[in-house]
Design a protein with these regions (language model features):
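Ligand-binding cleft/hinge of the Venus flytrap
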Residues: 47-56, 131, 136-171
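A conserved helix-loop-strand patch within extracytoplasmic ligand-binding domains
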Residues: 99-148
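Immediate post-signal peptide segment of exported/extracytoplasmic ligand-binding proteins
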Residues: 22-32, 134-142, 281-291
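An extracytoplasmic/periplasmic, membrane-proximal ligand-sensing/linker region
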Residues: 41, 154-189, 223-225, 240, ...
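A bilobed periplasmic-binding-protein/Venus flytrap-type ligand-binding module shared by bacterial periplasmic
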Residues: 113-123, 224-237
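Short helix-initiation/N-cap motifs at beta->coil->alpha
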Residues: 37-38, 58-72, 172-183
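Short, well-ordered beta-strand elements
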Residues: 25-39, 57-62, 142-146, 245
Length: 291
């Protein structure tokens, strides 16, 4: 069913005894889906590390696009996903599967979508999406809005924003998160003007001096929450892992800092650092507050 999926077992190649708890041999691996976005990658790999190390369960991580993630959880091909942006960004995807999935909990609050510009662009030149209609601004930006992948909710909302604001002569550049970041990095090095689609939390705000521009029409939505979705019977079939995922919640500031660490080192090192720095938080997720 998932011909295009890339499945990675975190336990592959590791010798016996690496983990403090041996894998439960009588239980199938926990299959968690994720899309190639930096926030999703960190929280998913953090969860997988703890499920394997602390709960003794093998985890298979399945990377694909957003739509197949929702479909996979709804069909039961995946046990869970940890990146449901609601109520607006993923509204269309969620509406199609809401009766076939279970919401386990919210992994973080305060998520935000928007368009960003570098801080070296004067605010009196660009403070709002409305300002992009100025002829001199359009010329500086070359009529481009740097975007991400075509299946992203941010892409859909940004396409609508171009229409809502009457940005004639502008084109949303469909790419990927990596492609957008490459363009941003190159532009900043040359002090070129640009506007890019982005979201919080994201490590780019730790690396570059960026600011959101106002969205007076609310085309890109308000603050959102990012939820953990599971297949219908997951809580009954696997109450220990489901309980862990339902309790896992990160402050958005801590998450953004960890994502920046991941870019500076690696996701694996950033995950280990987060676990070491937040022992009480991790114990609460594991249901071990009292020992």
């Amino acid at each position: 069913m998932f011909k295009t999926l890339v499945t990675m077992s975190l336990a592959a190649g590791l010798v016996a005894g690496t983990f403090g708890t041996a894998f439960a041999e009588d239980k199938a691996p926990v299959k968690i889906g994720w899309a190639a976005w930096s926030d999703a990658e960190f929280v998913t790999k953090l969860a997988a590390k703890l499920i394997e190390d602390e709960l003794g369960r093998k985890v298979d991580l399945v990377q694909t696009d957003v739509a197949p993630l929702y479909q996979g959880v709804a069909r039961g091909d995946l046990d869970a996903m940890m990146m449901a942006w609601l109520p607006q960004t993923h509204a269309d995807y969620f509406a199609k599967v809401k009766d076939k999935v279970t919401t386990l909990g919210t992994v973080y609050d305060g998520a935000k979508l928007g368009w960003v510009v570098p801080k070296y662009i004067p605010e009196d030149a660009i403070s709002s999406i409305e300002d992009l209609k100025k002829d001199e601004v359009k010329e500086k930006l070359k009529g481009r809005v740097e975007g991400i992948d075509p299946g992203a909710g941010l892409t859909r909302l940004s396409e609508e924003a171009v229409k809502d604001y009457g940005l004639d002569g502008y084109k949303l550049q469909i790419s990927s998160e990596a492609g957008m970041l490459t363009t941003v990095d190159r532009a900043i090095r040359k002090k070129d003007w640009f506007v890019a689609t982005s979201w919080s939390p994201h490590w780019m705000f730790g690396k570059y001096e960026l600011r959101y521009i106002d969205d007076p029409k609310g085309a890109l939505g308000e603050a959102e929450h990012v939820d953990v979705l599971a297949r219908k019977d997951f809580e009954k079939d696997d109450p220990e892992v489901a309980g862990f995922l339902s309790r896992m919640k990160l402050p958005i500031g801590d998450l953004e800092a960890a994502m920046f660490d991941a870019q500076e080192t690696s996701y694996e090192k950033a995950v280990d650092k987060y676990i070491a720095a937040h022992p009480d938080e991790v114990k609460a997720w594991l249901g071990k507050e009292d020992g």
